[in-house]
């Protein structure tokens, strides 16, 4: 669960992110620059703008923390609007005047969970009758990082495996006994926005054990594991966010070394 992939280039405007700007734009010749036009990846990695996602995301985060703005410089991209019509529509929708200066404002953001519910090669979990596929599942095919578009192949392969496995089950095994549990009076939940803010601070691209421990201490004051008799969809979503954030934090603390998308902040 500690392996959360951050994409380096999300379209950003006034501190908000609006969508992903594909690495194909850099592959077509775009460069990552700061507000002064400096090539920010030039001294970071031999592959510069085409370095692995985790390396680029960490480098851009360091630039932001140093007070810089980051842009994709499109001057060397041929026929950008023709080759990237959907990205052009996204930029136009948010009224970013990239045609005037050939610059797209970007920043890193959370993108993909390499971890998830542990499954075998058929998509089965440790709970009989429960299957997981796609980003919710941890099939092991991504390891500590993920190559672009491999998640699509994962979904194609494992959805077929899951469907075949379920189809081959005897009819009597296709129903499960409901899980009995004591119902709580109500959830004790944090404000969703506060949870997201604290989780982002503790579980961001480069992490600190102290900040993760502080986050877990804060999270421990809430009871989000006891299902009440009555709850709203928003409450259930927030409770699930708490569970996922707790799992990521605990897994991150257990992983002492830097590996792939999981990296400790240098002191």
Task: Give the role of each language-model region.
Residues 2-102, 156, 165-171:
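An anion/pyrophosphate-binding glycine-rich loop and adjacent beta-alpha core
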Residues 10-16, 111-113, 144:
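Short secondary-structure transition/capping segments
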Residues 15-16, 70, 96, 101-102, ...:
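Generic signal for short, ordered secondary-structure residues
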Residues 19-24, 107-108, 244:
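Short linear motifs in intrinsically disordered
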Residues 38-42, 49, 59, 112, ...:
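Glycine- and aromatic-enriched mobile tails/lids
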Residues 85-131:
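FAD/FMN-dependent oxidoreductases across multiple families
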